Amino acid sequence: MSDAPQFPPLFEGLALSGSADPFAKAKTQAIMGCDAGLVVYNLAADQLRAAIVFAPEVPLTEAMPVLISCAIGFQNALGALAPPEVAVHLDWPGGILVNGARCGRMRVAASTQEASEVPDWLVVGLELPLIPLDTETPGATPDQTALYEEGCVDVTPDTLLGAWVRHTLVWVNRMEDEGLKPLNAEWRGLAHNLGEEVEWTFGEDTEAGTFVGTDEHFGALLRSGDNTRLLPLSRLLEGDS
């Protein structure tokens, strides 16, 4: 369906096929001690799935914003490849929105969930539907979409994947060199539902309130009445450490 993606130096690709899950494979490879920069991917006809392995050198709280770097990297990559009228936004729990409808998500896992510990590894995953799950009834779920439904049929998965990794690298480098201020400024311009009422589900738990912004490490601030509470970015970590 597509050519092999082109990655920046120090990044190495590992292609999967069939139903194999790149996010799960990347976690397995990380546990086995693979090098940082491994990009595991599965480019199917109906969806793009990929995951990048990172090796943080800072405690988990300071490492988690790499998820934001990856999300902004994807937005920048798709924004550069898609027609100019296509709008791409991000929501705090990792969702991707294209022209206002949900279109895939980011995922994250790490070797620890302890805020003060330095993770051995951190994996960020991307899942992006290319065509609707139900092609017989397009428009049946107006709040959800797929990339090719939004005028992006000329964006090939291999090109988009390579661009995602390149743009992510730019933001990871900026985060390391300049701190979180540039990342925060970019993200605020892309954030979905900022200043609005939200209801987010985390497993069996639901958090609701007015999304008023983030703290210095991109934890979400939700206001309910006179009370404002913090949801750390580590709340998005999947699975057991």
Q: For each of these PLM feature ranges, what is it?
A:
Residues 40-55, 59-60, 68:
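Primarily the active-site beta-strand->alpha-helix module of PP2C/PPM metal-dependent phosphatases
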Residues 48, 96, 219-220:
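Hydrophobic residues embedded in beta-strands of well-ordered beta-sheets
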